[in-house]
Every structure is written in C-alpha cells, then in structure tokens.
C-alpha cells in the first residue's frame, strides 16, 4: 500500500528537481566502490563478491512527456503501455524522445533553477527477489552509478529517495523497504532538472539509467569509508602506506581493523588496530576512525610507464579474528607534487601526452562497457598517449581501475559546466548554487581518491571563475593535499588552479580576449610572478581533417621545461548510428534527430571515429609524442629516451637505407637505453647508389614481444632522414619519332602511335586523351584553386550565421568557387623533337581577375607530356586553398601506387609522421571517410604516381578517389556520397595547410598559407 507521503502527487508537488538546495534526499554518503567480501582471499584476488548483485538487464519502461502525466498506479504495478528496455541504456537510443547535440547553448530555456513544463520522464520498474539471508541481517543498498538527470526511487510502493548529478553514484538504503518474495523497484527519471544547468557540456544530451545498477549487502556493523595514501622518503627507497578506515554501526571495544598489503601472492606488510584515532582538537578524536601506517622497503613505484600495483585488503573483524567484512583496492606507490614550477611524478617532471575523452558509443550512446573502455586504453597506449582527461565529468568507476592497471595518468573532472550562462560564472559565483557544486566536487574526490592513476583533480569545465570555485579548491587542498587541482575557467591562471591550464592557447600567437586573454604558451610562462607549470587542458582541435601544426606544440613542449604538454581535443567522434528506410546504418550528428537547438557536426572532434577506427591524424599524434627521439650525425644515430622510469627492455631499432623506396642496406640493433638516457648507434659504411633518386635512412623502434597493451611487432617510434645523393644527369633518350600535330578550327590534335591528345582551342584545355580507341578523360584537365571546405575552413560559419573571417566565407566572397576561366592564349608549335601547346587563362569573378595561369604542354617522341604551370595570384584576393590541376579519369583501377609520403593521408602542416617510400594501396584507402565530407586523402612529397595505365612524375601532392570536390562540398553526410563514374584526380603543386589549433578561427600558420604572388610547378604525364 502506498502511504500518502510516498505518493507521486506529493513528490510532484515538492518539485525537488527545481530546487538547487535539494541535490539529494536520503542518499548515502560517498565512498570508494564497495564489494563487502566475506572472505579476505576473495578480496585480495578481486573475485566477484557474493554480496554484490547486478540489476542490469531487462526493465519495464514507459515514457511520458512530463512527470505530471505519470499515473499514480504506476507505483504499484506496471502500466499496460510499458515496454521492455535494457538497463543500462539511454532511452533516446531506444526511440523514445530525441537526443540533442549542442555545444554552448542550453537545450532548454535558461531560467535557473526552473526547467520546462514539458519535461520528458522515463518510468522504469523491475521485479526481483532478495536472498532470505539478506533480510535477516545487515543492510541492503541499491547503487545507481549514473542516472541522467534526476530521479525519484520507490520500492514496493514506498518512496525511498531522490538523487541528481548524472555522473556520480546515488546509493540508498533499501533495508526497511524490502520484503520476502517479490520486490518491485520504480524509478522515475526526469530529463531536465536544476542540475541540468550545471551539465552544459559539449556532448549529446541524453537521459535514462545509463550506468550500472546493483544491490550491495553489508553487515550492520560495517566499513563505511577507507582512504589509502602513500608517503616516501627523499629517494623513494622507503614508503609508508597510510590507510584511514571509518566504520558505522554499533561501536564495540572488540572491533579491530587489519590492513594487509599484497604484491601478488606475497604479503608485504600488515597492521591491526582498534578504532579510535589521533586526537584532533580539545574535544578529542574520532571514535569511529582509525589510521594504520604500514612501512614498505624499496616499493615498486607506480607510473603510467610501469604501472606496478599492490593490493590493499581492509578487514573489519573481532578481536578473536572473526571476519565481519572486507573491502579492498589496488594501490600504486607514487607521489605527485609541484616543485620549482614543474609537475613531478616520483620526483621526475612529467610530459603530458594527453587526450580528452567523452564516454560515447555509436550504438549505445553514453553507455560504456568494459570492452570499449579497454579498447580506448589500448589505442591510447599504442599511440603514445600517457594521460587522459575525463571530460567533463567523473567516468564509469571501472575506467579508473583500468587506468590504474594499464597505466594512464588521469585528470578527474567534476560534473560542472555552465558554458551557456551569461556571464559564465552566473551560477558559480552564486552561493545558492554552492551546495550543488560542492556535492559534485566532494563526492568525486571521496569516490576516486584511492586510484593512483588520478594525479590531478579538476573543478569542472567552462564555468567562469566564481567564489564557489575558490571554496571548493580550498576544500580539496585541505582534504587531499597529495594532488594538484586544476581549473581553466576565468582565464586558466586564477587562484583556483595549481596549473596554468588554458584551452587552445597558441604557441606564439596571443589572443587578447577581454578579461580572459589567451597568451601564447611561451609568453604565459614568463608573465611577472608566474611560476606554475603550464599544461593545456585542451589543444589541437581534431575536428574532421585537422591537427595541422601539431608538431609546433611538441617542439615547444620539448624546448621549455615548464610547458608540460596537454590534452588533445578530443578522443572519439560523437556520431550516432541511425538507420535508413532499408535498414542500413549511417552516422548521424547534431540536427539529424530533429533536435533543436543543435551544433551540427561540431560533435565530431575525435582522433578516432565513433567505432574507434583511427583518423589519419592519430598517426601524427603518435609520432610527435613518441618516447624515443633521434638525431643523425654522420653515420651515428643518437637515440634519446623520454621515458622517466622505464629502461628499454623490449625494443629493437630497425634501420634501412632505400633509394626511391628500393632497399639498399638494413640492420637491427637492440636498444639498451636507461630512463632519460641516450644510446649511440654506429651504422656501417652506407652504400652509394649509382643511379639518381632520393636516398632515405629510416629507423623504426619495434617491440619484438607482446605487452599488456600491444601485440608483438608493434612500432612505437620512427624517424627518417634524407641522405646526400650522388649528382647525376639523366639525358633524354633520343627519338626519331616526332608526334604529329593536326589543327582544326576547334582543336589541336597530337598523335603518336596509338596515343592521341586533344586540346580544345576555345577553352584552351586538354579535353581528351586516347590509348587506342579508349578515351582516358571524362572531364578536361583544368586549374583548381579550391577545396571542399574542411571543418577548420568553415569555423562557426553556417547558413544562418555567417562568419566573414572564416576561410570558406573569404573564398566565397572573393569568388574562388565561382571563378570562370577566360582564355588568353592557346597556340601550338611543332619543335624538332616535340609538339608544344601553350595556354594562358585568367580566372575571373564579376570582372575581376583572381588568378592567371600559364601552361605549356610538351609532348615528345616517347609519349611523355611535360606540363609546366606558372600561376599569378591577385594581391587582393584571399590566399587560395590549393594551386593545382584536376580532371576525371575514365579508368577505375583497383590500386594506387606512388613514390612519396605515406601511407596515411598527410598535409603540408601534418606530415611529420609520413614516411617517404613506394606505397601501394587499394583505391578505397585513398579516401578518408570523414562523417562530414570534406577535402581528404592528400599525399604530399610525391615524386611518382601510378594509376591504371597512367604515370605522373614530378614534385607534387595528390589525392585520388571516386568523389569530386564538388560532391564533397555539397554533401552533408558520408553515406550520401555516391561513387562517380571514373576516378577524380587532383594534382597540386601547392596546398594550403589544414590548421587545427582550434576549429572556429583561422588557424593555419602563416608558413603554411599560400601567400606568395607567383607559383611555378612541373610534372610529367605519360601512359604505360
């Protein structure tokens, strides 16, 4: 029977979800994850606890447009319209309601603490049985690890409690509500609450019970909290494990706590004590707490490089040794501190190779499973990341355990963001919102502070700087002085942060925004009185085809010790799978669900696609972050290790000298490099090739044995140097055959054997080529000065909000996309050994000349067509995206072969990871399937390209695919692209960089812009 105080009407009348002073009702205090083992050996080995029962699985679910629409009868029994959904899940992924993607703008009308009357509500119910022994003794708790955004809980028709903060557990005592036989849970989840105003993160806005639900049975007298910390002497040869244990229940003199420390099967230390701590003040000590200190000689230290872990088992027992319960956690002996302007781990200055990670899955929304978490960690480790920022909320509890075990440094961030407020600190400077903010910070610390991987606490993200931040900064520093605190809001260098932690500050360029200037990172270090380390909390915005200029950051990080790295934005594209009318899956972004407001494709900023397939930019990050650096002097390779703690023990250095991709000599040397040490490797006398070509020395560091995070043969580092080559002159082969030139009113036609070339005299273009009777071109060869806009080219510009400073808008305004060619010259001459076609075009828009292109085509007796191009750029037109040629080839070949930089896509400001070699890949691999189509697939530094029956030689960049730049520009999603007839070839003499410092302002560095007034390039085109 539902009591009147438990009724739905009473709960609705209170409107707890619109009261910032009510963040919970009856929720239990925060603590580290518990399992309440009743066997200490099971606790030591982390076996499943019989006292912890998962409630994940099928629940009954009914959706309503508002909480007032929920019938009172639902508290007693399932509704006829109820469906079955899997918990954990987001209800939007089951077709209820729509996910909303927005970055800054709140998805609801801003009127804190009030939310819309139309407040989608999900009603979950589950019927379950409880073990009889659980009812007879002890306490049974229910734990919701994550519910978005707020919920009320009933058990057997009786109201239990209320919780909000979607990213931390809400735990309730069910003991008084359970009964023998069947029990029924009813959970009413509201999409919007006053807490939503603190959760304005750049992500999909989804709802539901999206993390695990479990029951935990603890004894009446129980461990209610425990906290472990490690202390060291100066040289880390001796350590102390401090374990503070708190109990609740009936305090008896015979109660004891034993803390034992294990390394595998070996007990390292152990201590036992009764409750009653040290005297705190004139009123005495805590009777329900005790601190034990265990001495450890020569501890094996924890780091991301060598994640040594011990296991601490905390036993609550009687004086005669009878175990009441045990809790346990992994322990990493490590020390984090800031000293002399440097962030130190175990006394060594860290270089943060970090990335921001949202919890996202293309099929499951914000539900994380262990397989996905492990996959993310393995990919991060394999690509030389050593740190992750939990952007922008505490993650699933398992994530931290995995980071402890595999080795990643973690910035644990409170679930606070008020980016859409004006000003941003409207709530964070308001004392009425301090309780809500406080719970989000303090409960995060209380849950996660036992994890060695957590090396920095973060007060949240993009919430301005308010007095509440200062208060919470001081709380953390008082409760946990063992870790620094960072917070970017208010300018990245306020009194609420131990680390200067800007986002998107540039290496050398100041961005003097009012009140919150972003100085260049080099300048920031030298500001008067500034002594803190600088670690970018976000940098290198990896949206679409991006990460240009990444190497510039890493040059600065290695040059300035107090520039200690940063966290790339971000790890994974947040696209979601939808299905078309035929059941085919496609990747969706903001607006594709009818969601308003929305920020389109801005949710896709990842180094990996949503399915965790790497973007090409990930390879650039891997290369720049590699832990081995190389220098070549003569025939000596100097290898420097940037590992702080790890001596190389699983690395071979492979070296190879190749001429135009053909190996001439190679060798292998085991690496034996101490942490932060060097090794000199003497190469033998290198061969001197007799023929012309590019001579390259390539070194690769290979791991011969598999590790916890990589397979055998994993390449962790590499470098290339171009070596000096012998000078040689290649004389053209004499041919007694001269191509035949035929002139008509419309065309110049050149014929040589079974090959023909046709130039249209009215357009001045190479209009067709034949090999025998087969046409080779579907479109003429013409100049190209534009590209399908990248996200970085578009910036924040969109149909309803034009940003005139965006590259794409500047190109459009100047007429680059609309320019048409006016023929200035088209002549043909027969030379002694060749036919020469000379053309000139003025590319014009609205009567204004933007470019003048002059070309010569020299077709000789060998059938080669040498093309020389000279381009003049108008001084008052924006720098073009590219200067090159394009055509649609008739052939569709299976593979592409080239001599140049590869194998992955590379651009002028993102090519340090690419290697010069001869590459051969399927045509499909030349296209990068960015969800939002754009320019893609470029390969730079090309000396030779072979495709079908064609060959091109010179010094150029190219991309080749089934999609034209026009189609890429006009198509909103990759699944809407259609393979066109033939193959589109773009050959560029010059291509602008792609940028990537951020994606909302022009970020291509000056040295990678096409700012010259004249350009010259050449290439040779022949048929095989």
From Swiss-Prot:
Ligand binding (Na(+)): 202, 602, 605
Cofactor note: Binds 2 magnesium ions per monomer.
Entry EC number(s): 3.2.1.23
Residues annotated to bind substrate: 103, 202, 462, 538-541, 605, 1000
Keyword Mitochondrion: no
Active-site feature positions: 462 (proton donor), 538 (nucleophile)
One GO location term (cellular component): beta-galactosidase complex
GO MF terms held by the record: beta-galactosidase activity; carbohydrate binding; magnesium ion binding
Site feature (Transition state stabilizer) residues: 358, 392
GO BP term (any one): lactose catabolic process
Signal peptide residue numbers: none
Lineage: superkingdom: Bacteria
Residues reported to bind Mg(2+) 1: 417, 419, 462
Entries under Gene3D superfamilies matching the protein: 2.70.98.10, Galactose-binding domain-like, Glycosidases, Immunoglobulins
InterPro entries: B-gal_small/dom_5, Bact_Beta-galactosidase, Beta-gal/glucu_dom_sf, Gal_mutarotase_sf_dom, Galactose-bd-like_sf, GH-type_carb-bd, Glyco_hydro_2, Glyco_hydro_2_AS
UniProt: Mg(2+) 2 binding residues: 598
Keywords attached to this entry: Glycosidase, Hydrolase, Magnesium, Metal-binding, Sodium
One Pfam entry name: Glyco_hydro_2_N
Catalytic activity: Hydrolysis of terminal non-reducing beta-D-galactose residues in beta-D-galactosides
Cofactor(s) this protein cannot do without: Mg(2+); Na(+)
Subunit structure and binding partners: Homotetramer.
Family from the record: Belongs to the glycosyl hydrolase 2 family.
PANTHER family (alphabetical): BETA-GALACTOSIDASE (PTHR46323:SF2)
Protein name: Beta-galactosidase
Name of the gene this protein is made from: lacZ
